[in-house]
Amino acid sequence: MAAHGGGGVEEDQAGSSSLCPPAAEAEAAAAAAAIARAARPPRPGRDKRLGVRHPLKHRRFRAGGKAAVAAGAREVGEATTVAEATATGPPKGSDEDDEARYICGGWTSDDGRMSCGYSSFRGRRANMEDFYDIKSSKVDDNQINLFGIFDGHGGSHAAEHLKKHLFENLLKHPSFITDTKSAISETYRKTDSDFLDAETNINREDGSTASTAIFVGNHIYVANVGDSRTVMSKAGKAIALSSDHKPNRKDERKRIENAGGVVTWSGTWRVGGVLAMSRAFGNRFLKRFVVAEPEVQEQEIDDDLEFLILASDGLWDVVSNEHAVAFVKAEEGPEAAARKLAEIAFARGSTDNITCIVVKFLHAKMAVDAASSSERS
């Protein structure tokens, strides 16, 4: 990916070209078949972000209902409150293969204003280090819906910590409703600090991205650290709501070098010759340079806003923003769309874990709610 400066977002960070969804049907069919053939024994892999080989670990991902990939969605279908669901298996309404390499499902918000689909696939990697979280709650009578993708590297500890604690911490922040942007930034930093303090093995270098979409009333707050990404479809156009944190981004490189760090080329641009992203949770020995300070974008929900896509780089490395939006539009609903995105990414040769959330806005329900509110007033 080419370097880009500033803190703004790009319309298509993975490149773009026109793609008619019907022309992709053959690719989609091949993708589904490829997913079905993916149940082969795991093998050691390379963590491309750390640039090192690591042994086969976390065999619990082969243990059916106790798989950590399933843990990423326990709230969905089981509980839509801040409280953690007690179920140890996949969520109700989800599908999981016999070795927990692929899980998908759907969810509709309590207020009926949005629905989502999610898909998480270990893919060609030996280990599953992607986690995700979907929560719904009320704070001071405000309906809150939260969606997050956490893509781990060097191990799954950091991503799992975020899945368990990031939204929990945010919902407890005293300024969450009155100053949401500041609350998000402070919560990201606190959760990073808590993880580093809680990790007893100081030699571990686990890290994780975070791409989150937080819905408060009629506003969306998208925050990101790392190279997971959130893209919206607005009036038919793909628009990125986050900007990947890469070491060769002009502003990021300057920040790292001002802090005494270096950015070097080793297969790709890396911080200290090691990490292929410039911001992350964890990464203790690079913490001075690799910060967990999020960039936060605010977006008002209007009738032109059709859906959001949140995904790990297992999708974005091989599917452009525009193509992802086109694939989602071609599907009947968000659950089928999330599944299709994972299938397409795998068929196109993605070598990473692939996790996607598609959030669709149900504007008819929103209009009814607005009319009812107007009549009461």
From Swiss-Prot:
Compositionally biased tracts (Basic residues): 51-63
Catalytic activity, EC: 3.1.3.16
Gene3D superfamilies in the record: PPM-type phosphatase domain
Region (Disordered): 1-68, 80-99
Family, per entry: Belongs to the PP2C family.
Recorded GO MF terms: metal ion binding; protein serine/threonine phosphatase activity
Biased segments, Low complexity type: 21-39, 80-89
Note accompanying the cofactor annotation: Binds 2 magnesium or manganese ions per subunit.
Organism ancestry: Eukaryota, Viridiplantae, Streptophyta, Embryophyta, Tracheophyta
Record domain PPM-type phosphatase: where: 115-361
Cited Pfam families: PP2C (PF00481)
Highest taxon listed in the record's lineage: Eukaryota
SUPFAM superfamilies: PP2C-like (SSF81606)
Residues annotated as binding Mn(2+) 1: 151-152
PANTHER family noted in UniProt: PROTEIN PHOSPHATASE
Top class in the EC scheme: hydrolase
Keywords in alphabetical order: Hydrolase, Magnesium, Manganese, Metal-binding, Protein phosphatase
GO BP: signal transduction
Annotated binding of Mn(2+) 2, by residue: 151, 313, 352
Protein name: Probable protein phosphatase 2C 7
UniProt cofactor(s): Mg(2+); Mn(2+)
